[in-house]
């Protein structure tokens, strides 16, 4: 394996995980903050807000997991190496 391809694969794997984590991290922080604010304003809707929050957090976390899968594919099943 060429050292250039190996170095580029490691760099791309790091970028994949890093960039895939930025958006969901910001979104999860915003969603959790808004959920806490909503529960503080309307305590009787806590169950519905919490359920919606957990579902949306799971969908946001899936985006980070996709980035991790791409990174693992680049590191261990590199398609650029013959």
UniProtKB/Swiss-Prot annotation:
Gene3D superfamilies: F1F0 ATP synthase subunit C (1.20.20.10). In plastids the F-type ATPase is also known as CF(1)CF(0). The lineage of its organism: Eukaryota, Viridiplantae, Streptophyta, Chlorokybophyceae, Chlorokybales. CDD domains: ATP-synt_Fo_c_ATPH. InterPro entries: ATP_synth_csu_bac/chlpt, ATP_synth_F0_csu, ATP_synth_F0_csu_DDCD_BS, ATP_synth_F0_csu_sf, ATPase_proteolipid_c-like_dom, F/V-ATP_Csub_sf. This is ATP synthase subunit c, chloroplastic. It comes from the Eukaryota. Its main location: plastid. Keywords: ATP synthesis, CF(0), Chloroplast, Hydrogen ion transport, Ion transport, Lipid-binding, Membrane, Plastid, Thylakoid, Transmembrane, Transmembrane helix, Transport. F-type ATPases have 2 components, F(1) - the catalytic core - and F(0) - the membrane proton channel. F(1) has five subunits: alpha(3), beta(3), gamma(1), delta(1), epsilon(1). F(0) has four main subunits: a(1), b(1), b'(1) and c(10-14). The alpha and beta chains form an alternating ring which encloses part of the gamma chain. F(1) is attached to F(0) by a central stalk formed by the gamma and epsilon chains, while a peripheral stalk is formed by the delta, b and b' chains. It holds the Pfam family ATP-synt_C. One of its GO terms (molecular function) is proton-transporting ATP synthase activity, rotational mechanism.
